From Swiss-Prot:
Residues 29-132 are annotated as: Disordered. It holds the Pfam family DUF4643. This is Proline-rich protein 33. Residues 73-83 have a biased composition (Pro residues). It comes from Mus musculus (Mouse). One of its GO terms (biological process) is response to wounding. InterPro entries: DUF4643.
Length: 260
């Protein structure tokens, strides 16, 4: 018997200590005051786990159960409080009224309590939106200037009728083609005037048969070569032969030789 008592003491001393939770019922008044949703109960370990623990320890296992009553203070089992987020969310509406006076004071027409002498805001005239075509026409169009009339001075000299001077310098220079055609027509007029006139020894002009008509242009384009041939001065003909007293010797001799 003594040995059995010693064995029971040894086994009790070697077994680990397990905490035991004592559950007490809550009073009826507390339950009505704080009607909060009950937290889900802690899941109990499976029966296989309890059987293994019973075999090892050979003692009763008591599973702690969280009480349903919550104290006013913070509970270690409760989730983290959401007070910082609520404060952070509620901060913008509290800070907004403080920001609105600044925005109002920054407006040009508003005057804050610190602005004792508000300065007038300069008004800028709106610029008319003009298109590119309108601006281009304004640049290209010249503004009409008022004609400046000369002052009338008393003239003591008798009035003389003003003769308009021939305007020569204002005429544009004639082109080369027009000058060639003028020369051709002039030659034709000379040929018609000297058609019946006999050619004398002093006359150098000779009517050309080709001047009776205009040169025929084979191509529709302007041919300057044919006009140049017509415009060339006519060759001079000497109908009377000049007889010299001593005929010219056309025989040539080399230098250093004499004819005997």
């Amino acid at each position: 018997m003594a040995l059995d008592g010693d064995k029971s003491l040894c086994t009790s001393s070697t077994q680990p200590l397990i905490p035991v939770a004592h559950i007490r019922p809550l009073p009826a008044g507390v339950q009505t005051v704080s009607p909060r949703p009950e937290e889900p109960s802690i899941t109990r370990p499976p029966p296989s786990f309890q059987a293994s623990v019973n075999r090892e320890s050979g003692a009763r296992v008591v599973v702690p159960i969280a009480p349903t009553y919550r104290s006013p203070g913070p509970s270690p089992y409760s989730p983290p409080p959401a007070a910082p987020e609520a404060k952070h969310v509620e901060e913008p509406p509290t800070a907004r009224p403080a920001m609105e006076p600044r925005n109002v004071s920054s407006l040009p027409g508003a005057s804050g309590p610190s602005d004792l002498h508000p300065y007038p805001v300069p008004k800028v005239a709106p610029k008319p939106s003009r298109s590119g075509w309108t601006r281009l026409k304004k640049q290209l169009m010249e503004e009409a200037k008022e004609p400046a009339f000369p002052e009338l001075k008393p003239n003591l000299e008798p009035m003389q009728p003003e003769v308009p001077a021939p305007v020569v310098g204002l005429q544009p220079p004639a082109s080369r083609a027009s000058r060639m055609w003028d020369a051709v027509l002039y030659r034709m007029s000379l040929a018609e005037s000297h058609r019946d006139h006999p050619v004398g020894p002093g006359d150098r002009g000779h009517p050309l048969a080709c001047l009776n008509r205009l040169p025929f242009l084979c191509r529709p384009r302007f041919n300057a070569r044919k006009l140049q041939e017509v415009v060339r001065p006519p060759p001079t003909f000497h109908p009377i032969l000049e007889l010299h007293s001593r005929p010219k010797n056309f025989n040539r001799t080399a230098e250093g030789w004499r004819l005997q």
